[in-house]
Amino acid sequence: MVFAKALIGRKIQKNVRVEIEEGYIRKVEVTNERVQIPGILIPSFVDTHAHYLPYSLSLTRPRLDGIGDLKSALDFIAENVKKVPHNVIIMEGFDDSKWERSLTREDLDRITERPLVVRRVCGHKAVLNTSAIKILKERFGKIPNLNEETGLAVEDLPLALSKYFPPSEEEIEDAIIRAEDLLISMGIWVVGENASIRYLRKLVEMDRAGVLKIRWRVAVYFNQIDEAKEIIKYESENFRVVGIKEFLDGSVGARTAAFSRGYTDGGNGKLLKSDEELEKIMKTAESLNLGVWWHAIGDLAIDQALRVLKRSKKPEIHRIEHFEFPREEHYKMAADMGVKLSLQPNFVRRWGEIGGLYHRALGEVFFWGNRFRLLENLKANYAFGSDTMPPGPIYGLLGALHHPIKEERLGLEEALYRYTTAGAEIFGEREFGEIAPGKKALITIITEDFNP
């Protein structure tokens, strides 16, 4: 077949013939033949950091995506409470970054006496009504980082919502099926999933049954490492544990990301682990031939991540997730160490505009963040992922192409490379990730419309 354009290596070539046989690319050449397929042929998108399984589960619940003010959110919640048959009502996806204020326990108490939990899109913040707080205390006792007066929960409960309100086995399997269909529809054949133990077990079960369609490269949470020992040993084409996940800080939206300078509305966030705890996690990962996946958004967390990784004899096997607001020296340090970085350009588009959430919350620190051009110039080992906020690469590509700081924008070839080949390389994949003879034909076609 002759394609109008194709990403070959790091460059887009015109009029490219690609021959595929038995699932492998056999021949690639520039030709003068008539174009048969428009658009741009690219290697499969690789979403290096995602939460498609809990996201797919959340699609069975009322979602507040796109609701731009508090009143509309409360109206939506009140209307949808009536539609949820379960005793505990869980709603997902609110983004209060442009509201006059966030939700409170009292807001939710006025809507229903049934237990109600509403989780923010970042996953680091949730608001509960009195009934939900009561049922949690009865089942689990005191919940860490839950303010019973305001109903605000950060980090522990929202991040582990499925531990407190566990889905059924059928719901988990349905979430995996739904996630794969969604991924394929977006041209993603390889995903780096942050997966809790029940999802891991179900993925392995479904892989053994031969029903998985895409390649899952997953990180297990450190607090579940003992339960995951046997799963870590399991490996196939479509499933492999590649990392151990731990949080060093939280999110900007929840005001829990850790910064050396304070938020404009107060507080600095805090580090969640000591250096000694992180070194133990790193050594555990290395003993299992895995890398760490360290969530680090604020400069204090990034500084800690790099400081501890310096103690490793092989820092290049490890990853820092998000790496959003490093100080200038952190960019060079990460590049020099060869540390893998998974960045989310969709955050730039969603919250990174001048006057947006990041700018309002961080002031001048905003300008430290997501410096893609600097990373290119330093030849850093980085790739893109979505964190499923929202899912899919196209939204994020626009964040890289139309970065609010013009000097940090990427060109189309660079951005596509970071969402395809660079992602495969970060996972250590050699069989696919390029449009080249001998490579597995994991490919997709995109249009050329990348207007903001």
Model-assigned labels for residue ranges:
Residues V2, A6-E21, I25-L212, W216-D226, ...:
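Divalent metal-binding segments
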Residues D207-G210, I231-F239, E286-S287, K313, ...:
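Acidic (Asp/Glu)-rich catalytic clusters
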